[in-house]
Every structure is written in structure tokens, then in C-alpha cells.
């Protein structure tokens, strides 16, 4: 069964759910280490492009490395929902130090808010993926870019190599140019930013970007503490829900030996 989707940037196409043969993609450790699983899954399940949105691939297949991170994640959510249904259950631990209970939370993936790419952001992306803002404390202009699939694949290595300087490393990766600052001095400038400017810059990244809001509020069933968590996105995301797995176990146990 196929389904037509429109991604946050306007990219539209026909997708299908995962097939058994896609299991090899999920099980490929080398592919997982290189960050290529998402590209492989999307390439396998994207059947037809109906509207290229802000991208220009011509008659070629979609280069998922050039697609915005928000579009990629949205498409993955739709593939997962088409494969197993929109319900997604996952385990959590209560953040209340006096509780720490483990519990399961379930949500409908279709209920996650989606932020479309604005016309202004689309124009900036098409014209070189270059966005401009002015830092409130430093008072200088900064130019930055939105993350694509190629960046997404490099993120694990960046996090490993950044160590305790993850914020400055992430800023340095996204910031293209700082007014009056040479390329050799850009890293030092970013490390000397006030936290107010750093927070402002991260907010600007989000403001002009598109995608799915994955911050969700859950409530511990034991102590009723409300807490905000990020939607878990790991290998379990592409596996059947616990209800489906339980039904499989029930069928197996009731089968004649």
C-alpha cells in the first residue's frame, strides 16, 4: 500500500511501508555506524516524487543527503506509520528523584506538531542555504545554514570529537560567516559568545527551519509528575509496537507444537 505525503518544505511524493527486505538495512551495523540507514530506508520506501519543493534533482532520484533534516524525519515518521500504524509506544524513566519509576508511554505520531518551511526560508535555502541574523549582545551579523542529510550523517562523529565543547562545535558547524571576523578566528569568536547570544542563535536556527516538534510532555503514572522528553528515535522506532509483538507471542504460544 502506498500513500502520498507532503513534507514540511513542500517536497511531495508517494511512499510505501517497509518490506521484509528492509530488515537488512536496520541490521547493518556498518551502515548504522556511518549514519547511512536513514538514506537507505528513505531511498527504498520513496516511490515517486510528485513535487520537488525547494530541491532541484532534475530527472535523477532524490539525493537524500541534500534534503533538509526536517523533511527527512517527517518522511521517516510517515513510513513508520504506514508500516505499523501511527501508534508508537516506548519506555521511560520518571525524572522525579523521589520516584524513578519505569513506565510506558504511547502516542499517535500524527499528533506531533509540524512546522512548515516559510516562504522566506525557502527562498534563502534555494539561494545557497544562507541565512542572516544579528546577535543582540555582540551586535554583529552572522550567516548560517540549515542542516541537511549530509550533516545528519556527520553528527555522531562531531559529537564524539567535540568532547565538552559540543555547543561551540555545533555553532561552528552551522555558522558560515561572522561579520568582521576571519575564518581562522571564527571558532574563538563563537567560544567567547555570551550565553545570551548563543541561546539567541540556537533559537534562530529553529525559527527559520522546518520539521517535526519532537518534544513531548508525559506524566508519570506513579507520582503524576509532568516532564518534557524528546521522542525516542532508535532502532526500536522501526520495530512493531508492543501490542503487535504481544499478539505475535500469543499466536506462537497457542500454535500446536
Language-model features: locations:
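Long C-terminal interaction/binding lobes of large macromolecular proteins
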Residues: 1-257
